A protein has these predicted regions:
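Histidine- and acidic-residue-rich, metal-dependent catalytic cores
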Residues: 1-325
């Protein structure tokens, strides 16, 4: 949050919201009262779901002054009396209020990009290589687009689609993503749902062009892809660029179930795909003609971003260890 989102000033709220109040008495930082409210709200949500009909918000009283701040708890009591918050949570009223309020949130283009990048980086907390794959895919897309002389608008749409194309994998169990073996059909089908999950998450939040590019990243021009089995006539160059870039990056990198492909194998796969109609001929041929240049530039640029991410991840792990001793 501090380095990779528009929420730099609020980042300590997340850093400290699991730390007991009595351990933070000598720690002064902006948004400290809001952090205490967040802590109370989170535990109320957890208890409300866990205890169901046995839930009683007064349970928090035994922890006032130790785990939770007195003023934050007083605000909780006032909110319960004034707004009937727990009944609204139970009957779903707040979901409608939240959906309505989101419609009035106005963000600049810069803020939108930062939030998207933050969302993309969260995949790295689950599996670091997922962030690497996404960042490398972004830069391969950019280099292919440059060679094809795409407009600034088209390049931007591909960029945003590439940022979010794999966020659905956050919902896929790690033991399946990391499986060092051939997956069962049921497991493959589960992994395939990451596209639909991503689609649901971004539908209505981005322009339809961006959505269409992102949801087609596993489609193939011969109809052999998923989830819809689209064919060439139903797709466009922007979709083909993300498909090609994602395919190339996947082959270049090691996977739990196989070693990385070498250059000759990648070129053979793409050439065969052009002949069979699996890949868009113009896009794939552009990549092949400039293979070395595109890969070198894209991976150099990606490494700069990844170095920053890896440093932040190490810092996160150290902070986590300090607070869990």
């Amino acid at each position: 949050l501090k380095y990779l989102s528009p929420l730099e000033e609020q980042s300590k709220m997340i850093l400290y919201h699991h730390v007991d109040t009595d351990k933070l008495q000598d720690v002064d930082y902006q948004y400290k009262p809001e952090t205490e409210i967040l802590k109370v709200a989170e535990i109320m949500d957890i208890w409300h779901m866990a205890f169901v009909e046995k839930f009683d918000y007064h349970m928090i009283e035994r922890y006032i002054g130790t785990k939770f701040d007195k003023r934050a708890c007083e605000l909780l009591y006032q909110a319960v009396e004034q707004y009937d918050i727990f009944n609204k949570l139970t009957d779903g009223s707040y979901y409608n209020e939240f959906e309505e309020s989101v419609e009035y949130v106005l963000l600049s283009d810069e803020e939108k990009e930062k939030y998207l990048r933050m969302l993309m980086y969260t995949t790295g907390l689950k599996k670091e290589s997922m962030v690497a794959d996404t960042i490398e895919t972004i830069y391969v897309c950019k280099e292919i687009g440059r060679k094809m002389q795409l407009s600034e608008m088209d390049s931007a749409e591909i960029y945003y689609a590439a940022l979010v194309h794999d966020i659905g994998t956050l919902a896929i169990p790690e033991d399946i993503i990391d499986a060092p073996r051939k997956l069962e059909d049921a497991e493959k089908n589960l992994i395939h749902t990451h596209v639909e999950l991503m689609h649901k998450a971004i539908e209505g939040k981005f322009s339809q062009n961006i959505v269409d590019i992102a949801v087609a990243h596993h489609e193939r021009f011969d109809g052999s892809g998923y989830p819809k089995g689209l064919k060439g006539s139903g797709m466009n160059t922007k979709q083909a660029i993300l498909q090609t870039a994602e395919t190339v990056v996947s082959m270049i990198n090691d996977k739990p179930y196989r070693k990385a492909y070498n250059k000759e194998d990648i070129m053979e796969e793409l050439n065969n795909g052009i002949v069979s109609g699996k890949y868009d001929g113009v896009v794939a041929d552009t990549f092949l003609r400039y293979y070395d240049e595109i890969v070198e530039k894209a991976f150099q640029k990606a490494q700069v971003t990844l170095t920053t991410h890896q440093r932040l991840l190490r810092n996160y792990e150290q902070v986590y260890k300090n607070f869990t001793k």
